[in-house]
Amino acid sequence: MAEQEEKQTRRATAARKTQETDITISISLDGTGSSSIESGIGFLDHMLTSFSRHSGIDITLQCQGDLVVDDHHTVEDIAIVLGGAITEALGEKRGIRRYGWAMIPMDEALARCAVDLGGRSCSVFRAEFSRPLIEGLSTEMVEHFFTSLAGSMNANIHIAILEGRNTHHKIEAIFKAFAYAMKDAIKVEGNAVPSTKGVF
């Protein structure tokens, strides 16, 4: 019963307002993968919608960013706020698997992602993109998104593209691999903190 009650409360809302962005994100870790994403960047909306669907995490995201400058502040701050919301929703992380990994194909592209939610912030990203921009998103910001997310979540995120040519396919495979890795890592299997320390 206690485990069920904890799962039902794994929801959070996080916000950030600066002179560059105004962002509010609400999530439910035990959702159905439904989402409403309005980042102002079409391709980022597509990727976050895909992440929500495949992870099972419900996400509502509203962002007003200084896109007249570029997409840097918007992408970075969305990652910071999303990471904060996930951290808050996880609470003490009792009973979670903690670790998750996935290898996902998207046509000729193949992405691998491994996640550790144990409180140690680290991001390793190995991918190259032939296009500098795709549907409003600077492809160099994909790595920065996951670096910022790992820092905000205090998570260890390893991402690598093993095969691929098409930029769209490679980035979409990355977000889907991250989704399935997170889906595993946040699963509740008991009530203990998954660490020999007893705490994170």
Curated annotation (Swiss-Prot):
Location (main, coarse): cytoplasm
Enzyme class: lyase
Gene Ontology biological-process entries: L-histidine biosynthetic process
Gene Ontology molecular function, alphabetical: imidazoleglycerol-phosphate dehydratase activity
Signal peptide per UniProt: none
EC number from the UniProt entry: 4.2.1.19
Transmembrane segments: none
Keyword Cytoplasm: yes
Keywords: Amino-acid biosynthesis, Cytoplasm, Histidine biosynthesis, Lyase
Associated pathway: Amino-acid biosynthesis; L-histidine biosynthesis; L-histidine from 5-phospho-alpha-D-ribose 1-diphosphate: step 6/9
SUPFAM superfamilies found in the cross-reference section: Ribosomal protein S5 domain 2-like (SSF54211)
Gene Ontology CC terms: cytoplasm
Reactions the enzyme catalyzes: D-erythro-1-(imidazol-4-yl)glycerol 3-phosphate = 3-(imidazol-4-yl)-2-oxopropyl phosphate + H2O
Subcellular compartments: Cytoplasm
NCBIfam families given in the database record: PRK00951.2-1 (NF002111), PRK00951.2-4 (NF002114)
PANTHER family: IMIDAZOLEGLYCEROL-PHOSPHATE DEHYDRATASE, IMIDAZOLEGLYCEROL-PHOSPHATE DEHYDRATASE HIS7
Record family assignment: Belongs to the imidazoleglycerol-phosphate dehydratase family.
Name this protein carries in UniProt: Imidazoleglycerol-phosphate dehydratase
Provenance organism: Chlorobium phaeovibrioides (strain DSM 265 / 1930) (Prosthecochloris vibrioformis (strain DSM 265))
